[in-house]
């Protein structure tokens, strides 16, 4: 599982870093993202490009997103 931490980065850096990491995922591989806010625009892109994800709100106010490339 790959992991990236984009907490605290100003826009558009979180999206750019997540997108770059997604490009290197193999089918069925998971990317774990730590981010300081819930990235709603990212969800539309993930849905449209064949990824599934699970978002968990963490006790410290951050979010953990597990993203899987479907094929």
Protein language model features and the residues they cover:
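Generic structural detector for well-ordered beta-strands
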Residues: 5, 34, 66-68
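An N-terminal amphipathic alpha-helical segment
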Residues: 1-25
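Short, aromatic/basic amphipathic alpha-helical patches
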Residues: 42-50
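C-terminal edge-of-domain segments
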Residues: 50-71
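Amphipathic, hydrophobic secondary-structure cores in small proteins
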Residues: 16-19, 26-42, 55
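Intrinsic-disorder/low-complexity, polar/charged segments enriched in Ser/Thr/Lys/Arg/Asp/Glu/Gln
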Residues: 1, 28-32, 62-64
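Secondary-structure boundary motif
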Residues: 24-27, 48
């Amino acid at each position: 599982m790959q992991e990236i931490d984009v907490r605290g980065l100003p826009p558009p850096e979180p999206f750019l870093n997540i997108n770059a990491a997604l490009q290197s995922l193999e089918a069925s591989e998971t990317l774990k993202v730590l981010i300081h806010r819930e990235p709603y625009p990212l969800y539309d892109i993930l849905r449209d490009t064949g990824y599934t994800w699970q978002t968990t709100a963490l006790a410290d106010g951050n979010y953990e997103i597990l993203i899987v490339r479907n094929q």
